[in-house]
């Protein structure tokens, strides 16, 4: 056990020395603190029923955006892009949505509005994605993509 602790301590020391050299004399505590800040976000899952409804709305908005096998035809939409957007808007009013579900709905709405070239509602939808992230956890990728899209649209 002592040997294992010694080896672990040696490895930490060597890593610390390498980090000090590579980061220009940054303290080990600063490097470790930075590493602690980048913890994985544990976002809540999307329910299967909501996922199916979102997929149906996405097919209405843009059937070509649905992943499929090579040569497989695009799925047949059961409504117009406007119907898909309305379906998503109705889903955002559900009270039992978690932050991840709500942010994913707004992200898909942003896609729908962008497809229809409705820039003001696209911007509003991306802002709602970020607002959902203030209430609960959303994925870091979704947050960054929303910020990037807002930057490009403004």
Which residues make up each language-model segment?
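Bacterial N-terminal signal peptides that target proteins for export
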Residues: 2-17
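Charge-rich, low-complexity amphipathic helices
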Residues: 11, 127-128
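Register position in tetratricopeptide repeats
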Residues: 115, 152-154
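Aromatic-residue detector
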Residues: 1-3, 110, 129
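N-terminal leader/linker segments that initiate helical-solenoid repeat arrays
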Residues: 19, 25-127, 134-145
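Alpha-helical adaptor scaffolds
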Residues: 145-151
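Short, surface-exposed, charge-dense and proline/glycine-enriched linear segments
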Residues: 131-134, 152
């Amino acid at each position: 056990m002592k040997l294992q602790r010694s080896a672990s301590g040696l490895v930490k020391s060597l890593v610390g020395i390498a980090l000090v050299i590579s980061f220009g004399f940054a303290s080990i505590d600063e490097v470790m603190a930075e590493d602690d800040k980048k913890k994985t976000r544990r976002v809540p899952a999307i329910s299967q029923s909501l996922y199916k409804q979102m997929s149906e709305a996405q097919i209405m908005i843009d059937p070509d955006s649905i992943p499929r096998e090579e040569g497989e035809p695009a799925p047949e939409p059961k409504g117009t892009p406007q119907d898909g957007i309305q379906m998503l808007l109705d889903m955002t009013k559900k009270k039992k949505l978690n932050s991840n579900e709500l942010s994913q709905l707004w992200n898909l709405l942003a896609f729908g509005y962008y497809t229809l070239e409705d820039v003001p509602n696209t911007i509003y939808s991306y802002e709602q994605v970020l607002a959902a992230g203030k209430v609960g956890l959303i994925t870091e990728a979704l947050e960054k993509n929303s910020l990037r899209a807002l930057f490009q649209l403004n």
